[in-house]
Amino acid sequence: MILAIDIGNTNICIGGLEGDRIRFAFRMVTRPHCTPDEYTAELRFLLRRFQFEKAACTGAILCSVVPALSGPLAEAVRRLTGFEPLRVAHTLDTGLTFAIDAPERLGQDRIADAAGAAALYSLPCMTVDLGTASTYNVISADRRFLGGFIVPGVQTSLRAISAGTAQLPPIAPEAPARLIGKNTEECLNSGAVYGTAAMLEGQIGRAHV
């Protein structure tokens, strides 16, 4: 079993992978100042819930968009698995080439998205990862990473509009009951959700590979 760790800006996702099967998966809130000892204790407690056994682990892989947490999480993984986690990077043998400026600065999450899409789906394709920042990646038929787009995530946009205005309240996005909102909260929610969907459709229509 491979222990996979995905460090995002909002959540840290952990999964146990056996071949194509996900044995378990859970999330932790991303906290910027945790020590290796704290992460080791928290991970050990959560992994026990899924009957994780060190002897059954054959490796680990780490993907991070929060560089300050990569070291503490990697140390926790070493302690819990006995393995040095493989770090996602553009230099890994994913079968992709990177037709972009400064591939060493490309986010590890975008590399993982592109590699997974190229392995699982026909090309060319576009990946969309809706997170704190939403990323769009374009992969050509000959397995070249061509670049993409980065935009604020749905929740990030809603937080920004609330923080930057006097009367618009903070809300959590949910499936809208209708397109045209009848009150402020509905208008914010519909704008965020349908606006994101329209942007996604528009970018797909404009990206020709």
Language model segments and positions:
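Short glycine-rich phosphate-binding loop at a beta-alpha junction
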Residues: 54-65, 84-86
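Glycine-rich phosphate-binding loops at beta-strand->alpha-helix junctions
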Residues: 63-70, 190
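Conserved small/polar residues in nucleotide/adenosyl-binding loops
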Residues: 207-209
